[in-house]
A protein has these predicted regions:
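Generic structural signal for hydrophobic core residues of well-folded globular domains
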Residues: 15-18, 67, 71, 151, ...
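Short, charged, amphipathic alpha-helical segments
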Residues: 25-33, 51, 58
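Charged, low-complexity interaction regions
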Residues: 17-27, 43-50, 72-79
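Short terminal alpha-helical segments
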Residues: 1-22
Length: 359
């Protein structure tokens, strides 16, 4: 192991122990002084093969110094480490055929949005030449967030499968993407998947914060349900948003009286479907109400996948067809689409697979 490769590992190890309260702040300070003394005393020159490790080591050294000076709180260390690794990943990886973005032409066929499980199945078992041309497949940043999460699990190490995944996604959708827009809610754009992946990785600290908030919610669903005295019968979520308990929870939203007064829910949806705040705040809250009232909730340990499912559901509201390979997400999307009068069709991938492919 090269010298600065070793030092980088030592810093990461001691920071991990500090976060887990296995090392005190005084011991962290002593570690810093010892490393500093060792490097100054050695007068080492950086080996060319060790150059990248040295550059990363410097970033971790600055982080260590900020922690020792108590400028970075213990609970924020993980986000800072991820940010350094993500930045290094983006600097070192030179994607081939990166920018395949082109102008978006007129789309004259139904928009088909798919969750990540469906995408995994398609790229594994269905060659692109077998994909039907009857539908316009559309991806979203949520697909790249899930890909970035896999990259993080591999500690930001690059491998060629990332290239293959991006290439398949771009070709499957012809680079057609749903993107959030403050003025229009969600818009359809043409963009190579490489670009949103870069954005997601470069802003990974925001993803970590979102995951922490999602984990907190899922771990406290039962308490919230008890405190608000929300009770529903049944083992499924079908019709749950029309229950007395749901009405009690929904009554805190400014838009709910308008919803109640509108007999034709489709008209309510048409009025709000282009509102960024309704889509990314209120719709996410409706999703949480469904989860809170669910008598068979998803385990709290699955908070990451749950967060991505919510985001997929939000983007799916803009499609004509939403294909999912997740039974729980299918039930939830079906209930929310029914409740809001969303005209899109929610389908199970197994039933819809013949429609998506050419025999």
């Amino acid at each position: 192991m090269l010298y600065f490769e070793k030092k980088e590992k030592e810093i990461l190890d001691v920071l991990d122990k500090y976060q887990r309260n296995m090392v005190t702040l005084d011991e962290l300070k002593a570690f810093q002084k010892e490393v500093q003394r060792e490097i100054l005393a050695s007068g080492l020159e950086v080996d060319p093969d060790d150059n990248y490790n040295f550059l990363r080591y410097e970033k971790y050294w600055i982080l260590l110094d900020s922690i020792v000076r108590e400028k970075v709180a213990k609970e924020k260390i993980k986000a800072h480490v991820y940010a350094i690794k993500a930045n290094d990943f983006m600097e070192r990886v030179a994607f081939s055929n990166e920018d395949t973005t082109g102008p978006l032409g007129k789309i004259d066929k139904p928009l088909l949005y798919f969750d990540n499980n469906t995408y995994i199945y398609l790229k594994k078992y269905v060659p692109l030449e077998r994909i039907t041309k009857k539908y316009q497949f559309v991806y979203s940043p949520a697909h790249l967030e899930e890909m970035a999460n896999s990259i993080r699990r591999e500690d930001f190490k690059y491998n060629e499968s990332i290239e293959r995944d991006l290439r398949y996604l771009g070709n499957l959708t012809n680079n057609v993407e749903f993107l959030p827009n403050l003025q229009k809610g969600i818009v359809v754009k043409s963009e190579s998947p490489y670009n949103p992946l870069r954005r997601v990785i470069e802003n990974f600290d925001g993803t970590v914060l979102s995951e922490e908030m999602e984990q907190d919610f899922m771990e406290n669903r039962s308490r919230i349900k008890a405190e608000l005295s929300l009770k529903v019968k049944g083992s499924t979520i079908e019709g749950v948003l029309s229950s007395t308990a749901a009405k009690k929870a929904l009554s805190s939203f400014d838009w709910y009286p308008e919803y109640e007064q509108e007999a034709e829910k489709r008209l309510f949806w048409e009025k709000h479907k282009n509102s960024y705040s309704f889509l990314f705040t209120d719709l996410a809250c409706i999703d949480r109400i469904v989860d809170t009232l669910d008598n068979n909730p998803e385990p709290a340990r699955k908070y990451r996948s749950h967060m991505h499912d919510t985001t997929h559901l939000i983007y799916a509201t803009q499609s004509d067809i939403f294909v999912t390979n997740d039974g729980r997400l299918y039930d939830k999307a079906t209930e929310i689409f029914r409740f809001l009068g969303i005209p899109g069709k929610v389908v199970d991938y197994k039933e819809f697979l013949p429609e998506m492919t050419n025999a």
